[in-house]
């Protein structure tokens, strides 16, 4: 599967698993364009609200399991993104700064 097909399949799987997601952002080396064959996919899923962040991250990673891809999924609510997204040095900060919206 090509990289663009893998990305499209992953975005589709995440969007189906999280139908209320406001945005899905690809970040990290794949978004910057400096990925190599060993690079994973890094996704930020922004939802309107998140009751159980850890549980939601696990659930969304499981949605990607059939694709057999190395991926990390961060989940934040829109309010958390607004409050914490400008905190330098955090994964959320870099996801927003370097990432590109792939859904929503």
State the predicted function of each range.
Residues 42-46:
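Short beta-strand->loop micro-motif that forms the acidic, two-metal-ion catalytic signature
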Residues 1-23, 31-37, 47-104:
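Catalytic core of pol beta-like nucleotidyltransferases
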């Amino acid at each position: 599967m090509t990289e663009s097909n893998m990305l499209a399949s992953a975005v589709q799987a995440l969007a189906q698993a999280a139908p209320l997601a406001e945005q899905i952002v690809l970040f990290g080396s794949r978004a910057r364009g400096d990925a190599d064959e060993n690079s994973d996919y890094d996704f930020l899923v922004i939802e309107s609200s998140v009751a159980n962040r850890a549980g939601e991250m696990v659930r969304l990673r499981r949605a990607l399991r059939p694709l057999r891809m190395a991926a990390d999924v961060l989940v934040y609510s829109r309010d958390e993104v607004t409050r914490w997204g400008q905190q330098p040095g955090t994964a959320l900060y870099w996801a927003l700064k370097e990432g590109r919206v792939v859904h929503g």
